[in-house]
Structures are given as C-alpha cells and as structure tokens.
Amino acid sequence: MVNQHTAHQLPFASQLPFASTQLAATLISLDDWALATLVGPDTVKYLQGQVTADVGALPDNGHILCAHCDAKGKMWSNLRLFHHGEGFAFIERRNLRDVQLSELKKYAVFSKTAIAPDDNTILLGAAGAGIRELLASVFSQLPDAEHPVVQHEGATLLHFAHPAERFLLVLSPEPSASLLEQLGDKVSLNDSRQWLTLDIEAGQPIIDSANSAQFIPQATNLQALNGISFSKGCYTGQEMVARAKYRGANKRALYWLAGKANKVPQAGDDLELQLGENWRRTGTVLAASQLQNGDVWVQAVLNNDLNAENTLRVRDDADSQLTVQPLPYEITD
C-alpha cells in the first residue's frame, strides 16, 4: 500500500500543463513562488511609500497585484498583496524574492514594521473542473469574485476569476497536510508550471529575476489590472509611473502569444516579428510554457501597437509561429 504522505509529497511531480478549458480538478505545488510577511504598526504607511497600489484602501477580504519599483519606476518585482494574520503578506517569484526584500527593507529601519521571508507556510494552487466543490468539502467558506480573500485558522484562501475560477491557498503545514489527505486521491497533481500557464492565459504578468528592474508597471498591463493608484501619495518611482500615464510615455504592453515552436523561450529572451519576407527582433519574454497538446504559450512585453494579424516566432526558430491571443481584460492607459 502507498504511504499517503509519500504519495502526495511537495513539490508534486511535474506534468505538462493544460489550458484552463482542458484542466481537470488539480492541486498545484507553487514552489516557484515565495511568500513574505509584514507586521507592525507602521506597515500600511511603509508599504504606501513603496508600492504602486493604495494599500490603505485594500479591504480585509481583497488581494491586489501591485509593483515595487526602483527610483526610475522600473519594477523590482510585482507582488500579490493581501491581509494575512496580524499584518500583510505578498507572493512573488521565488528567484527574485531575496533581492526584492533587501530593496524593500532599505528604509524600514526607520519604521515599526518587520519584513521577513516565510518558507514555513505552504503555497498551493487549486484549479480545474469541479475544484470549488472539492474545496468546499474541506473548507467551511470559500472566497469568490465579490469576496476574493477568506481567512481560516492556519489558512488564507485567494480567489481568481481568470482564466477560469481558481484558488491560491496559503496554508500552515497542518491544514496543508489535511487538505492533501482529503483530496489527494480525488484530484490531479502538478507543479508550478501549471499555475504559470494559467497566469499566461489570464494575462497576469510574471516577473522573474531576468526581468527585474527592466520594465515600468504599465509595460506589463498593471494599470489594466487595477494595480496602480494614480491618486495616492508618493512612492518610490511614482514620478516615472505617472509620467508614463500623463505624457503617453509608455509604448509597450503585455501580450499572450500561442502557437508552435521547437524550443520554449526563456525569461529575458527576445522574439522575432514578421515584416513581409523578413523577421525583426522585438520584445522580451516574461514567461513561456509548453502544453500537453504540444502548443507553446509565451507571455511577452511588446510594442503596444501589435494586433491579432501580426505573426511572431521564437528567435532563430524558422518553424516557429506565434499569434496574439485575446486577454480577459481591456488594455487601458
């Protein structure tokens, strides 16, 4: 007989990911993402001076994707920010968390706020057909579009509407073990690449270390995701972020591309755009994934005048062909 604990050990074994429309109920180990926490009486005030969102306006039952920028308005990282325990927490890509935290802490010595990485808490994604019903058998209350965050003892649950309903579970070890014991045999299991694939489909920007301090928030559609407040007080990089809006300085946007390729590009790679008989290098890859059906999906920052008629390809891959896919939101200024 298989020992339950070894059968469902984290991280889960990697399978090729599925598009949201093809995905069966799946639990996803989010080992490529990492958590940080902030507690103390000055936390809201301190964060207000560091991130693009209006932290004071974030409700207890809400979460927001915002950016932490350098003085030039370039993003160290984007952060999924929410209330957690006695303070706040945020989730970002693991490969840049330590650098981002050291930047975030630079001025915290003058504030009553404690900022720390948290690797004891477990991050799990839950997505696919019937996942709400399965989670409802474990948790007495689940978040939804109107109340996107629900707190339980040892568990913070985040709701995402796109590309199809999914959940991000922020769990203490005990609730995590209990969840896996109850649902482990009723769901598929996969690793971070499945969640990354859903983020690409949803147009949620992925900032890895290769692209840290490279882009202003608007180049990754953060304004369209309500991640930038243009009415709050000062924060690091605000002047450049505001200039991009009011002077039309931003000429880039985030795109979801799909098609065929012989290789999956890496974060930081450029792509090629077809111009008649020729191909011209363009853009920057943020993330990419090869799906179960062989398709390759790419999330890239490109000139914001691209449209569905444009054809792109992975650099130096003559057989590659990628086209622009519709995002579930309008790109605004």
Swiss-Prot record:
Pfam family for this entry, one? YgfZ_barrel
Disulfide partners:
none
Superkingdom of origin organism: Bacteria
Listed binding positions for folate are W33, W195
What is one process in the GO biological process aspect for this record? tRNA processing
Q: Which GO terms describe its cellular component?
A: cytoplasm
**Which keywords describe this protein according to UniProt?**
Cytoplasm, Folate-binding, tRNA processing
Q: Where are the transmembrane segments?
A: none
> Which GO terms of the molecular function aspect are on file?
folic acid binding
Q: Which PANTHER family match?
A: TRANSFERASE CAF17, MITOCHONDRIAL-RELATED
Q: Which family does it belong to?
A: Belongs to the tRNA-modifying YgfZ family.
HAMAP family associated with the record: tRNA_modifying_YgfZ
Put simply, this protein is called tRNA-modifying protein YgfZ
What taxonomic classification does the UniProt entry list for its organism? Bacteria, Pseudomonadati, Pseudomonadota, Gammaproteobacteria, Enterobacterales
